[in-house]
Amino acid sequence: MKLTKIIGLFYLLFSIGCSDFLDEYSQTYIRASKISDYDELLLGAVYIPSLTPVPPTYYVYPSGSNVCDFLNVLDDDSNVTTEAEINRAGGDKPINEWVAMHNVLFGYTTWQQFITNTELTEHNDQTTWVQLYQRIAIINSTLAEIDDIDVKTDEEVADYYRVKGEYLFLRGQFYLLLANLYGKPYDPETASSDLGVPLKITAGVEHDKDKDTQFERTSLDRIYAQIVDDLKASLEAFGHSSKHVLYRASEEAARLLLSRVYLYMQEYEEAKTVLEPIFSNITLSSLVSGDTLGGNNRFLTEENSEMIFSQGSQFSEVCWTANAPDFCVSRDLYDLYDENDRRKGCFTLNTGTDSIALSYKYNTGNYRARVSDVLSMRAAEAWLNMAEACAMIGGASEGTANEYLNTLRRNRIVGYADRSYSGEELVNQIRLERRKELCFEGHRWFDLRRYSVCKKYPYSKKIYRSFSFYTSTYALDRIETYVLEENDPAYVFAIPRTVLEFDTEPMPDNERPERIPLESAD
């Protein structure tokens, strides 16, 4: 079966009306006949690809037009470089491209009420929503049929379990992203009434012409229950057949993601239990025994032994140069690192702007960057998740939490001596280490959300963001400062306008406040 026929079928759903789609479906649908068809579909239409710059001399940069590419400009680890004029000396993109990136990310990084409709730019905000639901539609149809495939050889049986496990993993991951972008953070006390996103796990198109609302938002507790079910089912499938390949989901990836889900749900015993088997199959890389970061020596590459899984592109290679109007690393983050902490070598001081650049965490350059900065998974998170779970359990488990925390630090900080913490201080140290270790990897925004509803040790903070506005001749016009309040409604994204407009009576939206600058500096 040709991959293009399979992919084309599912994309009809988003290009023509529902009733027309049903007619088209009955006329053109061709059932996959062997497990390799589903494997081919998985690679071609379900995994999020790593983008190749076009033309090849350009970079791929965040613009809201790729799945979750904006995540790392939302939180308190980044800021915007402010200078009297735009300075792209030595840059590889035309200045208008850098200005376009600056303008389109304004709504995201300053948490505007309408993130894609601002004074600087106007475009649609549906990309992440649509692309994830497109993939979920393919997964749903595949899972409805894959058990009917006739597998005969041992190799085919192994491939069946592996491929099915990957589909289940990806549906769980995609719904987790959607729920944490368009729903409130999971609060066990309110999850049964808090609205998430539409939950659909069945195949086919369900359209009732007599209903004014076709899509309804599902409560967070039901969405998370489905995510857990999918990831548990993927683990069961991977138990029969799993290969640890960086760009394919595996048992290790499923265990790590499920532990993250349990932390979001504040189910710490479950997080600990699902993680325990993983440590015999993964390793931490050591920064203290190798060369310092710099030059061609970068931290997160395909060759790093602690990489578990990655899909999608890498955008941090280009944004955090600390040249105006690019982004820079916040001083708040930079000052957290001890001078003996080798991770500090990821950052460099841009002497021209006195701002901090993210220089050596990822490969940089105009090429296909394969390790994602928003959708990759690695061993360090497993150590941090286990430490957090044990710290929250408390009692004798605090000793285990300290062991995992100290192990990670010994591999990052030269001359580090083990320390012992307890109670809230232990949790705070783990959160601190998580921020330093996983910065610019798509974690911090979601972590800040979940900390705010943590029952045992809640935490929230204000985030300040300065943003530079430039004239048509690239001279500085003004600098405005915005603030994201503690527990701000803008921690939840609005439902895309095109989704709301589809129905006569739209699903409830997430209200975001108008974002007024605190001050304006000329």
Give the role of each language-model region:
Residues Y224, Y268, A396-E398:
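TPR-repeat structural position
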Residues C18-I86, L333, C346, Y416-S420, ...:
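Membrane-proximal, proline-rich intrinsically disordered regions
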Residues I138, I223, D230, A237, ...:
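Alpha-helical solenoid repeat scaffolds, predominantly canonical TPR units
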Residues D39, A45-F70, D212-R222, M265-Q266, ...:
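Extended ligand-binding clefts on enzyme/binding-domain cores
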Residues M1-I16:
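Sec-dependent bacterial lipoprotein signal peptides
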Residues W98-G183, T218, A233-S241, Y367-A379, ...:
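Conserved, well-structured interaction surfaces
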